[in-house]
Amino acid sequence: MVAQADRLEIDRRYESQTQSIAGDLIKSTRAKNNIFNRMRDQMRWDDKVLEWTMANPGLRVQMFRFIDAIPALQSKAEIANHFQQYMSAEAVELPGALKAMINFSDPDSFPAQTAAATITKAVETLAYKYIAGANITEVIKTIDRLRKSGMTYTIDLLGEAVITEAEAADYLQRYLDLIEQLTQKAQSWQRQEGIDLADGEEISQVQVSVKLTAFYSQFDPLNPVGSKEKVCDRLRILLRKAAELGAAIHFDMEQYHYKDLTLQILKELLMEAEFRSRTDLGITLQAYLRDSYQDLQGIINWVKKRGHPLTVRLVKGAYWDQETIKSLQNHWSQPVYNQKAATDLNYERMTQLLLENHEHLYAAIGSHNVRSQALACAIAETLKIPPRRFEMQVLYGMGDKLAQSLVKRGHRVRVYSPYGNLLPGMAYLIRRLLENTANSSFIRQNDEAKPISELIAPPMVDDLDDRYIDSTTTSFNYAPDTDYANLETRLKAEQALVQVKQELGKTYQPLINGEYIETANYLDSVNPCRSSELVGKVGQISVEQAEQAMIAAKAAFKSWKKTPATARANILRKAGDLMEQRRHELNAWICLEVGKIIPQADGEVSEAIDFCRYYAAEMERLESGKNYDLAGENNRYFYQPKGIAVVISPWNFPFAIATGMTVAALVTGNCTLLKPAATSSVIAAKLTEILVEAGIPPGVFQYVPGKGSEVGTYLVEHKDTHVIAFTGSREVGCKIYADAAQLKPGQKHLKRVIAEMGGKNAIIVDESADLDQAVAGVVQSAFGYSGQKCSACSRVIVAAPVHNAFLARLVEATKSLNVGAADDPNVQMGSVIDAVARDRILEYIAQGKQQSELALSMSTPDGGYYIPPTIFSGVNPDHTIAQEEIFGPVLAVM
C-alpha cells in the first residue's frame, strides 16, 4: 500500500540520520539541571497537580471539568462550592492536601474562602504556564524573553469562538491593534541572524496567527459564497494593515467541518493581485486528518500556479477527541486517524513531501515529538535546505527543552504564544492539559524516562485506514445527517433544490384504495417565505370520500393483519431506503413548503428514515411474543393489530412525525389513514409516493387530505376507528380525546388516542455556565425554525450573577442571525407557517411589550409571513409570554 512504500522510502533515505539526531536531542532534554533548578522543579505545585491527575483518571476528568468552570464563577463561595461538588465524586481519589481543602460544610466559611482563594490562584498560575500573558505588556515581556533565548514567536489571540457579529468585528480590531503595538515594539529590536535574517533575507519580526471562523459569526460550509464574502471583507483589512506595517499573518486550521471552506477561501483570496506576491503569509495543515496528505499535494500545486512561496505549518492536530465524538454522534466517517502511530506516520510522510518541495514552500514543523523534529532536521540537512525556508515550532509552555536544543543546533524556532484573559483561554488550557496528561503524549513519556530507543522508533502501522468501529451491535443503525462540508454533497443539495423548484405548482390527489381520486375542492399550498409562490394544489376529500376510505381500510385489514411481520417490516425498510435515495429532494420540498432551512429539513428526513428502520426491527423482535407459564398453565403474551388507525400529522415536522406515526401503525398490522396538516399536504403526498413505491397494498395505507373540522372530525368520531395518532395543539388534542371517548352506534371497542400536544420549554443557565455554549444553544433552540416547536426554548431562566452578561450576548448573537427565505443559504431563520400564525404571534408580542421590557426586535423582509426574532427581559413568571405557548420566535428572559 502507499503508506508502506512511503515508510520504506523515509527509512532508506533519512532514517539513520533521524535516529542519530533524535538521540542527541533527547539526551539534551534529559540533561541534569543544577541543584537550584532541580529544587525548583520539585517544589512546583502545578507539576504535582498534573502528576496527580495523570495517576487517577477519575480525578483528571473532574479536575478538568472544574477548571473549565472556574472563569465563570464570580465569588469565592461559588468557587468553593463547585470545587467541593466536583471533587466529592466517587471516582475521585484525592491526595491528602486536596482532601483537607474540601473538608468544609459552609461555602462562606473561612476555610472555604481560603480554599477558594488558593484554588483560584493555582488555576491562574497553571493557565499562564501555557498562556503568554493576559495583556500586551505581559506578551511583550514574553517575546523579549524568547528573543533573548534565540527564538521568535507567533501570537494568537485567545477567544476566537465568536457568536455575534460585534465579536467578529472586535476580533478584527484587536488584531489590528495587536500588530500595530508589536510593530512599535519591534522598532527597538536589533535584527538577529537566524530568526530575523536568513540567507540575506529579512524575516518579519512580527507574526500573528488567526482563525477564519472568528471573522464571521455565521461561518458555514453550507453557505460558502456568503461566508467567503464576509470573511474576505475583514481579512483584506487585516492583510492591508499587515502589509503596511511589515507584519506576517498565519492562518490556523480549526475543526474538520471548516477545513475545506477555509482552504477554498484562502486559495482564492491569496490569488488576488493585491496579495498574490505576498510571501509573509502561511497556512496550517493537521496531519491527524486522513485527507491531509492530499490537501498538502493540492497546496503545492496551487503555490506553483501562484508563483510565490508561503509557509505551511505542519501540526498533528488539537481536536482529536472532539472530531472523533462528533463523527460518532453524527454517524459520519471518522476524519482523524484512530491510532496515534498512524498520525505520526502521516506526519512523517507530509514532512518529507513538504521539505522536498522547499523551492515552492516554506516549512514550519510544529511538534513536540523529538523523532518528528529529528526527521525534519535530517531531511533539511540532507537536502541542504536554505535556513529561510525551514523552521521549527513549539507551543508556549511545552517542549521548552526541545526548543532550546533545536536552537543550539542552529535552527530557527518559533514559539506559538497565545495570549488573553483566563475565560476565553480556558478551552485552550484544557486542550494543553489533556495533551500533557495523555498516556500517548511524547512529553509525558519522555518525562517518565522511557527508553530512548522506544521513543525514537519509527511509527509502525498496519493499516492507515484503520477507523474507529463502534463495538455496540444492534439491529438498527441511525441514518447519518448530511455533512454539508463535503463539496460533492453540497452540490447535490443545490441541484435538488433547483430541480424541485421546477416542479412547483403541480396537483396532488388523495390516495384511496390504491387509486388517486379526483376531488371537488383543492387547496393551494404556498411557500410561507414567499407567499405568492405556489408549491402545489392538493385535492381535499369530502366526508363521503372519507367513508370510502374507511370501507377500503376495513376490507384490507382482514389480510393485512395476517401478513407476517417480516413482510410488513421489509416494506418499511424499502421506504427508508427510498427516503435516503431521495433525501436532497425531500429536503427541498420541506424547505419550500414549510419554510425550514435545509440542514433542519435534512435532520427531519434522517429521523423519518430512522422511524422506518427502527420500527421494522422492533416489530420483528416483538412478533415472537413471550411465554409466562405457571404450573398447569400455558400463557402466551403477544401483540395483535387493533384495526384502523387515523394519523393526523402536524406541519412543523411534516415529514418526520407524519412518517413516524404512519409507519408505526402500518408495521403493527393496522390499516392507516393519513390526514396531514393543510399547510404541509405536498410533503405528505411525497411520503405517499414513497410508501406506494415501497409496496404498500391498496387500502392498507391511504392519503386523505381534507378540512380538519370536517374530514378530521369525521374520521376521529367514526365507529370503525380504533387508534388515533395526533400531534398538534393542546386545544385540538383535548377535543380529540373528548370525541374519541364517546361510543358511537355499532362501535364495539374503545378507541385509543396517542396525542403529542404543545408545551412551554425552558433552559436554565446557572452561574457556572459557559456563556459561549449557553448563548449559542439558546439562540439555536429559541429561533431555530422560528421557534415553531414544542421543544423550542421559549423561556430562559438565568442565575442573577450572570444575567446581564448573558442577556447582552444573547441580544448580540440574535442580531447576527439573517432572517429571510429558507432556501437562501445566507439565512438562519425563515418565516412562520402562515398569516394566522403570524397575526397570533404579533398579538403575543404586543402583550409582551405591555408587561415586560423589549430587549430585541429586528426588521424582516417583505413577501412572506415573517416575524422577527424577539427577546423580552424583565419577565415575571405570571406574565402571559411566560405562561402560554406562543409557537414562534419569541423568547422570555427571566
Language model feature labels by segment:
Residues V2-A479:
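Positively charged, amphipathic and often flexible ligand-engagement surfaces
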Residues D156-L158, K211-T213, H250-E254, T284-Q286, ...:
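Generic beta-strand/beta-sheet core signal
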Residues R389-M392, L434-I443, C529-I541, Q545, ...:
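Conserved C-terminal structural/oligomerization subdomain of aldehyde/semialdehyde dehydrogenase
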Residues N439, D447-V535:
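Hydrophobic face of amphipathic alpha-helices that form TPR/SEL1-like repeat modules
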Residues G514, S532-E533, A553, R568, ...:
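Residue-level signal for inorganic ion chemistry
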Residues S531-E623:
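Glycine-rich loop-to-alpha-helix module at the N-terminal edge of alpha/beta enzyme cores
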Residues M619-Q773:
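Rossmann-like NAD(P) dinucleotide-binding subdomain of oxidoreductase/dehydrogenase enzymes
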Residues I690-G695, E717-H718, V723, E731-P877:
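ALDH superfamily catalytic-core signature
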